[in-house]
Amino acid sequence: MQKIFTLSVTVIVLLIASLAFAGLTKLSENVYSYVGEKDASPSHSFAANAGIVIGRDGVLVVDTLISAKEGERFLADIRKITKKPIKYVVNTHTHLDHAFGNCVFAELGATVISHSADKTLLAKSGAEILTHAEAYGLKPEDLAGTAIVLPAMTFSERMSIDLGGVEIELIRTAPSHTDGSLVVWLPQPKILFSGDILFTDFHPFLADGELTGWLKTLDYLQTLGADKIVPGHGPLSSNKDLKEMQTYLIAFDRTARELAAKGQDADAISAELLRQLPKRSLAEWMVGYNVKSRYLKEK
């Protein structure tokens, strides 16, 4: 009975803690992940992840989710952890589910940072995506108050940020998921925010990807020796998940190419891929979209 009571108290404490942080998970003394894996709906950013790093001088935010509404939700949870000024926002890439919440943090005076290629991508496609949000399963009310905010600072290959006692490395890992994808690496606690280089338990979005570079990037990330990896989508991960992502990409590309060359249509190719690949979230929709956009563009 004593063991049961102790266990019950522990569970209650953990539940209270999770409610207090509302999605923020403490990874180290000053690093938190914001994991969205429980709700993969469009209005909740397709379960995109984000995070924060807290230094003596302020806060760095990693990705801002899909809308002003989602950004405000994220900000409210950040304020339960710290009242320090938010100095920087880093977009690991500028797809809508990772960068359309920029407006919330820019209003606070945060400097938004990305790789130069993904600033160009957002400038080219952001307004059009807002105009045709229904194509992404979003309703007008989901994007109420959302404005496209382009990164104010860019870099080419690598950038270091001293947040006051916390060293942060921004490393270009492209071309891969996009032409300007980057990772956020904290060498001291060995924590990596991979952005959409890594999808764990989710089928990845491949439409803008360059698979040869993506596979090389996954090789490189395994050499960093991260103790904890926050993927772009999915639960807290490890090097094992990076390796499984490589296996997935190779298998997807090989099978899709072979079947497309035989004249198979999108439904047949998707069905075979879903039969072969590990079961993951966003299955039929994502796999079908990837097949049509990468392997059947002329059909």
PLM features per residue range, with description:
Residues 1-6:
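Positively charged n-region of N-terminal signal peptides that target proteins for export
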Residues 8-18:
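Bacterial N-terminal signal peptides
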Residues 15-16, 223-225, 236-299:
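Accessory terminal helices/loops
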Residues 20-22:
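Boundary at the C-terminal end of the N-terminal hydrophobic targeting segment
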Residues 29-77, 182-194:
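Conserved beta-strand hairpin/beta-sheet module of binuclear metal-dependent hydrolase folds
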Residues 30, 53, 63, 78, ...:
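Divalent metal-coordination and catalytic microenvironments
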Residues 58-60, 66-68, 160, 167-251:
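Metallo-beta-lactamase
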Residues 76-160, 179:
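Active-site HxH/HxHxD metal-binding segment of metal-dependent hydrolases
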